[in-house]
């Protein structure tokens, strides 16, 4: 994997979280495999490469890659507008989080507790989702910038859906942080679209 593909893998995680949030908000449906992949990504320590954070297989990220390709190609027929908005908002929130050592400290201390729950219940268990959602609510949701999620109010008002959305936003922002640590910058999404697409298409084909 090239350094750019390492970045795109992490960015695929941001977009996967965004796609899953949009689906829950609009339909109330959850992709359990995607949810498990993203919640699991919060807890990976010492991965051998970026893909290892997401279970070691590009197929886990294919919905995120698809949304990212749609955003980079700027084709109205494939552009997923709400997921793109959520993804860009997560990239923005990560920048705010990076300036808050106190918040990073809280997240760093609580993730090992969530890891213990995962070992006991599994990654997509309601207790784990609730704990991740609560961590988002106690930290990132207090920042000045907020992510407004649009969808069917009946879905958004269900406590289990609200927890899943918050947990996915937490995981998406973790992926945004990883993308940044790998050298990702927002200007690349505008200036280097063709280069990114050239590196991204093979990741989709590796399904």
From Swiss-Prot:
Its main location: cytoplasm. InterPro entries: HflD, HflD-like_sf. The keyword Cell inner membrane applies. Keywords: Cell inner membrane, Cell membrane, Cytoplasm, Membrane. Pfam families: DUF489 (PF04356). Gene3D superfamilies: HflD-like (1.10.3890.10). SUPFAM superfamilies: YcfC-like (SSF101322). The keyword Cell inner membrane applies. GO terms for cellular component: cytoplasm; plasma membrane. It is found in: Cytoplasm; Cell inner membrane. It is a peripheral membrane protein. Belongs to the HflD family. This is High frequency lysogenization protein HflD homolog. It comes from Pseudomonas fluorescens (strain Pf0-1). The gene is hflD.
